[in-house]
């Protein structure tokens, strides 16, 4: 065996374009270092390749996995590319630009809009010194939208990542949970440079796919707005007309809205005829119940509403007939050290001021 592994020299690859430069990986009987592939460096003075060595023993499938990873270009950064992180928002976008070694090239904030996005693309090209847009890798937390579409149209390679996954990369820089646009943009640029496998390269979608995506987004927005309005309706009906809530779980149903428009208050619900309810149910093809059960649902609520309205109307009259003690000047009543008048003990009508005077 000797003092160490006797490696045969790897052949120096010739300059290649678009071909696989990796020669067959040599197998070693043992040792502390195991070459698993070639690290290719495209420098101005030529292309060089050398074995990648591990200081710990690497055997079997692990060696093959690392070799395949190096063949795909993972684990190495391309010095010819620049990496930009875009922390997007509804009003402004924070951009952080680095080179292939992770050194900061520039940082700037752009307003959201047509002019702002065009200025962002021009600034990336001018600051990085790139000739083509595909020399700049851009990281962003959203897979679609005007920012993504503008950058793709200008030729940039846009890569998307899930915001939850981005939070884990943020722990590399700081453990603080406060929102920082500059730090988030820097984290995205650094993560794209070191871990490109965690990102998803975006491409221009088919026009039909874009149209379907916009229609589905509109449908989701309308559904969310409908839920918001029905929740407000449920709260209001629970306050003054809870009987309607027992008729239908979906407060956005057309027949229930029509019924509510016909009897907006419990007083009107008490005067509605069953024939009117029957016509309404027939018009909307509601066969779960007939008019009499529906009328029985809303009749008790109407009576309860009338009783409550009577109590509300009687409160001012009761308050007007209540005896009020005459107000006395502040000098006679006295004041506490805090400046508030001294509170008198509560006395009911049976043992009030008249009873004390009689005693």
Swiss-Prot record:
Q: Which GO terms describe its biological process?
A: DNA transposition
Q: Which GO terms describe its molecular function?
A: DNA binding; transposase activity
Q: Where is this region: Disordered?
A: 1-31, 318-359
Ordered alphabetically, the record's keywords are: DNA recombination, DNA-binding, Plasmid, Transposable element, Transposition
Looking at the keywords, is Transmembrane helix present?
Answer: no
InterPro entries the record matches: Transp_IS110-like_N, Transpos_IS110
Family (UniProt): Belongs to the transposase 9 family.
User: What is the name of this protein?
Assistant: Putative transposase y4uE
Supply the source organism's classification.
Bacteria, Pseudomonadati, Pseudomonadota, Alphaproteobacteria, Hyphomicrobiales
